[in-house]
């Protein structure tokens, strides 16, 4: 049987491009090369598409993908040159211009099947404020928050924050991920600094009530028939799970499955599936929850292209469910082809 061609897109223009490289290298090593041949394309921080390595067998451990530090601009191509009939694209891209609907729209114009959520669900879930409003309408509990838009009366919004919330609070760019631009504030002075930081990344900012809680994550896999994994827990060695701790220092460990009451597990899995359907999710997502000391469950966020690094929660959650990393990739490709066939049929 002829191998299927799988195209990995990685890098990208967002602040999370380094995470994308780590994820792509992990996927590259986990692929079943009896079933797939692999082509990789690097998107630079300027948005150029670079044709990089091809693999017909598992690469050696010392093989590294091209990055912004090693980029060879002589291999630059037109973005549309990635098109290959019958190939499936795995956009291992995180953050804006990656999992926000941009690349998904590009791939739909090219008429190529791709792994993961479509334009609408990707763009919706990428924006924290919009996601919160959609999940509110679905009846899912979330922590109290205040939304800010650049240009609004800052003093009035700070007054609203201090009336509705209590310190500590967390300030987040609405349209970022991987803890980029997120900071904790224990007083108004720190809040002002946090708002300045968040507005550097986005024109819309979310301020959330800080809660003392365990951080629990649930994997989602499927299209209309989405299934959820047993939860896993992020166990931190630092007070705040920021970008530095999450990806660079690796100061976290994970408990899979998380030790939780059965009723809490069921609530989280049910809410994760409801949330996935509420945004119109396809393929995969990771749903993150807070579980407080007094037993409350709050949905924190949906991540439509979770990390795929060797220490990322999402593939480990499915491994715990009996689905090995190579089989997970095979399943995601099959789901991509299923979604593509339905999308094309609706357009005919």
From Swiss-Prot:
Q: Keyword Manganese on this protein?
A: yes
Entry binding sites for Mg(2+) 1: 288, 301
Q: Which reaction does it catalyse?
A: 2 D-alanine + ATP = D-alanyl-D-alanine + ADP + phosphate + H(+)
Pathway where it operates: Cell wall biogenesis; peptidoglycan biosynthesis
Co-factor remark: Binds 2 magnesium or manganese ions per subunit.
Q: Its GO biological process terms?
A: cell wall organization; peptidoglycan biosynthetic process; regulation of cell shape
**Cofactor(s) the protein requires to work:** Mg(2+); Mn(2+)
EC number, UniProt record:
6.3.2.4
Coiled-coil portions? none
User: What Gene Ontology molecular function terms does this protein carry?
Assistant: ATP binding; D-alanine-D-alanine ligase activity; metal ion binding
All residue ranges annotated as the ATP-grasp domain in the record: 132-334
Q: Which residues form the signal peptide?
A: none
Q: Keyword set for this entry? A: ATP-binding, Cell shape, Cell wall biogenesis/degradation, Cytoplasm, Ligase, Magnesium, Manganese, Metal-binding, Nucleotide-binding, Peptidoglycan synthesis
Q: Which residues bind Mg(2+) 2?
A: 301, 303
| One cellular component (GO) term of this entry | cytosol
Binding positions (ATP)? 162-217
Role this protein plays: Cell wall formation.
Q: Which family does it belong to?
A: Belongs to the D-alanine--D-alanine ligase family.
Name of this protein? D-alanine--D-alanine ligase
Species of provenance: Streptococcus gordonii (strain Challis / ATCC 35105 / BCRC 15272 / CH1 / DL1 / V288)
* Gene (name only): ddl
